[in-house]
Amino acid sequence: MQLNSTEISELIKKRIAQFEVINEARNTGTIVSVSDGIIRIHGLSDVMQGEMIALPGNRYAMALNLERDSVGAVVMGPYSDLAEGMEVQCTGRILEVPVGRGLLGRVVNTLGQPIDGKGEIKNDGFSPVEVIAPGVIERKSVDQPVQTGYKAVDSMVPIGRGQRELIIGDRQTGKTALAIDAIINQRDSGIKCIYVAIGQKASTIANVVRKLEEHGALQNTIVVVASASESAALQYLAPYSGCAMGEYFRDRGEDALIVYDDLSKQAVAYRQISLLLRRPPGREAFPGDVFYLHSRLLERASRVSEEYVEKFTKGEVKGKTGSLTALPIIETQAGDVSAFVPTNVISITDGQIFLESNLFNSGIRPAVNPGISVSRVGGAAQTKVVKKLAGGIRTALAQYRELAAFAQFASDLDEATRKQLSHGQKVTELLKQKQYSPLSVAEQALVLFAVEFGYLDDVELNRIGTFETALLEYANYNYADFMAELTKTGNYDDEIKNTLKTVLDQFKANVAW
């Protein structure tokens, strides 16, 4: 086809008219060094603290050090193929993770990507991992309980919704077991759970996921994994990712429980990053802001007011408070609670459950030391029936420990002392509990009633466990409606007291155990 000169000029004019000049400003820089997951970048002028920097190969780094002539960033993922001279680019975005109900029942990594082989996740949106905690006015006091199902915890160190309760102890003292049982006990309570595994073996995490599935608790739990094989950056960020997922429920007037297992390993990961970034080390080589590392995380666990929820949901949810309860775990070395990270977290939290290796090794499990375990705000949230009946437990144990130490040196003891020692031994025996067998409020109330009103006085020490099992079986079979109602209401009055008395009287009179 032949075109004459006029047609050609018309075509060129038409193309020129259609041409648009698109100016796209990109903030790019160049990698000048790569070492141990830390990259130094030259040429990024408008980068924010914590901003995501796009790397070659669909990967990201997070800007942590903003210096005069370079930026120190930590790589999220493998870094072995990164080299000097590679070009990187600012994204203008802070790290966000997917949030929503679609994450329940799933196992995800720090960035919210599924790692359980169950396909894609339908999330409800994204949330920044770093959020400022609710202010004083937006909060509400803690007055609703979180039942762990453990007699020793719910009676002596009760936990409320919106509280931060530290679980602290040496390795192999049952810290994770206590937290996992607390999650299992929420399967029918409506509390959504998030379990954040930091620096653990993949086999250990797989075992936890399997146990949650076996006990029907995985369907309302999100498992966030930053295993020992992951980079220090992902281990450092995992708790913040899990917290953002929990805040989704809190801000919509629901209740959530988050377990950080454990924050000692997160602090070590952060120390590694800080030293590689050449930040000045302080006590135990931790950086100066290691307190802020944990305080800004744990302050996000709170109970928020109806007004806060209504404002956040733009009026969709009215008259509901939301809560995020945190159970951070800290591992101590040879029972040293005065080390840097343990003292920091103790001062941030609203109480601690101290697990002792001596108690654990002598068969007292959960190995809760009632002398130094406290709950600073949970007392107001304790159910009425447990609060009323558990009053004498801590006193009995304190007196028993004092007398037991004294009795080692005394040859003959008077009747009153012998009675107190026997009572203390029986209370200690009764507070023992197997893993994966949480008790309901009514079951705990019945057992505590038996202690409080002397029903164990004629029971031999080695028969306490058998007595308890038979009593609970009898009550759940013959008084099922009463037990269900007591668990639901948690009230305590003369009528309930008389019914509990009747249950125990009839059990002791008619049942052989």
UniProtKB/Swiss-Prot annotation:
Assembly and oligomerization: F-type ATPases have 2 components, CF(1) - the catalytic core - and CF(0) - the membrane proton channel. CF(1) has five subunits: alpha(3), beta(3), gamma(1), delta(1), epsilon(1). CF(0) has three main subunits: a(1), b(2) and c(9-12). The alpha and beta chains form an alternating ring which encloses part of the gamma chain. CF(1) is attached to CF(0) by a central stalk formed by the gamma and epsilon chains, while a peripheral stalk is formed by the delta and b chains.
Lineage: Bacteria, Pseudomonadati, Pseudomonadota, Gammaproteobacteria, Pasteurellales
Disulfide partners: none
Binding site for ATP: 169-176
Enzyme Commission code: 7.1.2.2
Membrane topology recorded in Swiss-Prot or TrEMBL: Peripheral membrane protein
Function description: Produces ATP from ADP in the presence of a proton gradient across the membrane. The alpha chain is a regulatory subunit.
Superkingdom of the organism of origin: Bacteria
Locations listed in the record: Cell inner membrane
SUPFAM superfamilies (UniProt xref): C-terminal domain of alpha and beta subunits of F1 ATP synthase, N-terminal domain of alpha and beta subunits of F1 ATP synthase, P-loop containing nucleoside triphosphate hydrolases
UniProt-recorded name of the protein: ATP synthase subunit alpha
Key word Zinc present: no
